[in-house]
Amino acid sequence: MSETEIKGILGTKLGMTQIFDEDNRVIPVTVVEAGPCVVTQIRTVETDGYNAIQIAYGEIDPRKANKPAAGHFKKAGVTPRRHVAEIRMDDVSGYELGQDVTVEIFEGINFVDVTGTTKGKGYAGAMKRHGFAGQGAAHGNQAAHRRVGGIGACATPGRVFKGTRMAGRMGSDRVTTQNLKVQKIDADANLILIKGAIPGVRGGIVTVKTAVKGGAHA
């Protein structure tokens, strides 16, 4: 675990583009509209057993918030938001309810972890879903070329073990990609440019945090 203070923000994946570095090399980047978020709750060791802040992102019509959510946001002194996330950290003394959290928190940070929901692929077979090689193309194979094959033993244990890799729903998983390089921050436009690809579809909600491995300032 890195000793770097953990910071995080919610944002929207806008898509990918490319920029040029000082040596005129092309760098593929993902553009994320990060924040602005607002602090809606502060958790401490004394009251909750751990330190964390809850941040909210995305304006909504206040009339569309249910009563529990409306009351929660009212207590924080902010208007209702669409998305809420909790960021654990060692010290929350620098935060207060209603405080804005912007992309500027990543100034000086070189590496981040990005969490998002991957693209849904629908119902997929074992070859596409798990990379199975498939069965032989000839020698008596009848319409089973892409099937799984054996999924267990016979009378012992007499069942299929949980987690056996078979066909099923593929994608729509919560995934974190670690140690992505921060190429550029545009505080005026609330944008952060991250080298490479990140999980999710264009327009998907992502969480950007300082990298927990390898050192965010490396």
Curated annotation (Swiss-Prot):
Keywords tagged on the record: Ribonucleoprotein, Ribosomal protein, RNA-binding, rRNA-binding
A single GO molecular-function term is:
rRNA binding
**What GO terms describe the biological role, i.e. biological process, of this protein?**
translation
Signal peptide location: none
GO cellular component terms, alphabetically, are: cytosolic large ribosomal subunit
Subunit structure, as described in the record: Part of the 50S ribosomal subunit. Forms a cluster with proteins L14 and L19.
The family classification in the record reads: Belongs to the universal ribosomal protein uL3 family.
**Could you tell me what this protein is called?**
Large ribosomal subunit protein uL3
